[in-house]
């Protein structure tokens, strides 16, 4: 039996969520054949993962081939920053920037663990110095400046390094007249850095104003699950065009915080991308497998803008 046929058979029996789980919870004894069809999550952690939406078990190899999208329900699972760069940038054109920039524990912050240890563990686990990768590359032949946040690194939180790397990226894009793309995935400002983290919001917004308003260069913000806090309150919502992935969680404060502040019940799903789109806060919701093509078409239209031709003649 081929791997694909085996995989299809597993799907038929038990829906990839541990076959016959309803019977098992009622004291039902599995036959030898049923046990063979049962997928044990604990013993197959390197091969399988669970969809956060439909809870079906997904074979990781096939999931990666599908760009991190659940083939059962279409839910967009989180992917890391390197995978996003490979998804958007043409092969062998990526030039990273500021890879050696590392956060300093200026406040000597410590809660359950020291900030220094948290950074060290995150670097070992992800292979990244901090929660964003920035650089230059081609998107279907168009040179772009790209920043990609990584939620797996310190929850994608925005500290001094994240803010400085994005600031330098925007300044370079402004200097070289490049369009800018920032893919957001963040829990907000990094609390371990206090005011040093909060000030990054204003710093990034100020250089973005020069890039967009003074130089009339294009900035596209791509919001993914999750985009929250200080990132939403600054460059996440400053794009000339704001795109989100389907069902992405986008918010400033969490639902419980809002309910406790307003003292009223908030409807479910009001912080999901589809709800924000319905209320005019997003320009488009684009599935992950179509994103590169959509961005490419936007850049083609941008190149044909009449005001851009006038600027080139001056």
UniProtKB/Swiss-Prot annotation:
Q: What is its main location?
A: plastid
Q: Do the record's keywords include Protein biosynthesis?
A: no
Pathway named in the protein's UniProt entry: Lipid metabolism; malonyl-CoA biosynthesis; malonyl-CoA from acetyl-CoA: step 1/1
Q: What class of enzyme is it?
A: transferase
Q: Which PROSITE patterns match?
A: COA_CT_NTER (PS50980)
Give the co-factor note. Binds 1 zinc ion per subunit.
| Catalyzed chemical reaction(s) | N(6)-carboxybiotinyl-L-lysyl-[protein] + acetyl-CoA = N(6)-biotinyl-L-lysyl-[protein] + malonyl-CoA
Q: Which domain of life is it from?
A: Eukaryota
Q: Molecular function (GO) terms listed?
A: acetyl-CoA carboxylase activity; ATP binding; carboxyl- or carbamoyltransferase activity; zinc ion binding
The record's EC number reads 2.1.3.15
Please list the residue ranges annotated as the CoA carboxyltransferase N-terminal domain: 47-314
Q: Name one GO cellular component term.
A: acetyl-CoA carboxylase complex
Residues annotated as binding Zn(2+): 51, 54, 70, 73
| UniProt zinc finger (C4-type) residues | 51-73
List cofactor names only.
Zn(2+)
Matching entries from InterPro entries are given as:
AcCoA_carboxyl_beta, Acetyl_CoA_COase_Trfase_b_su, ClpP/crotonase-like_dom_sf, COA_CT_N
GO terms in the biological process aspect are: fatty acid biosynthetic process; malonyl-CoA biosynthetic process
| Xref: Pfam families | Carboxyl_trans
User: What is the purpose of this protein?
Assistant: Component of the acetyl coenzyme A carboxylase (ACC) complex. Biotin carboxylase (BC) catalyzes the carboxylation of biotin on its carrier protein (BCCP) and then the CO(2) group is transferred by the transcarboxylase to acetyl-CoA to form malonyl-CoA.
Q: Which family does it belong to?
A: Belongs to the AccD/PCCB family.
* Oligomer and partners: Acetyl-CoA carboxylase is a heterohexamer composed of biotin carboxyl carrier protein, biotin carboxylase and 2 subunits each of ACCase subunit alpha and ACCase plastid-coded subunit beta (accD).
By its UniProt entry, which NCBIfam families does this protein fall under?
Answer: accD
Q: What is this protein called?
A: Acetyl-coenzyme A carboxylase carboxyl transferase subunit beta, chloroplastic
Q: Which gene encodes it?
A: accD
């Amino acid at each position: 039996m081929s791997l694909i046929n085996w995989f299809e058979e597993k799907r038929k029996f038990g829906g990839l969520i541990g076959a016959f789980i309803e019977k098992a919870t009622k004291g039902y004894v599995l036959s030898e054949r049923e046990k063979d069809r049962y997928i044990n999550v604990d013993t197959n952690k390197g091969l399988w993962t669970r969809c956060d939406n439909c809870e079906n078990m997904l074979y990781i190899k096939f999931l990666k081939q599908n760009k991190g999208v659940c083939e059962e329900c279409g839910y967009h699972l989180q992917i890391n920053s390197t995978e996003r760069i490979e998804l958007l940038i043409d092969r062998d054109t990526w030039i990273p920037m500021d890879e050696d920039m590392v956060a300093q524990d200026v406040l000597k912050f410590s809660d359950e663990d020291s900030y220094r240890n948290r950074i060290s563990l995150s670097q070992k686990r992800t292979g990244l110095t901090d929660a964003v990768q920035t650089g230059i590359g081609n998107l279907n032949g168009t040179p772009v400046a790209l920043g990609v946040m990584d939620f797996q690194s310190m929850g994608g939180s925005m500290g001094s390094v994240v803010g400085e790397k994005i600031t330098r990226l925007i300044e370079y894009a402004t200097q070289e007249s490049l369009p800018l793309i920032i893919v957001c995935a963040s829990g907000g400002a990094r609390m371990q850095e206090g005011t040093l983290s909060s000030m990054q919001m204003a710093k990034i917004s100020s250089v973005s104003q020069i890039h967009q308003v003074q130089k009339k260069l294009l900035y596209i913000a791509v919001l993914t699950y999750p985009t929250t806090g200080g990132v939403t309150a600054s460059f996440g919502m400053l794009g000339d065009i704001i795109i989100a992935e389907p069902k992405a969680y986008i918010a400033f404060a969490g639902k419980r915080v809002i309910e406790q502040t307003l003292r009223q019940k908030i409807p479910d799903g009001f912080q999901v991308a589809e709800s924000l789109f319905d209320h005019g806060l997003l320009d488009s919701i684009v599935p992950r497998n179509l994103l590169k093509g959509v961005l490419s078409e936007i850049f083609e239209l941008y190149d044909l803008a009449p005001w851009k031709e006038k600027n080139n003649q001056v």
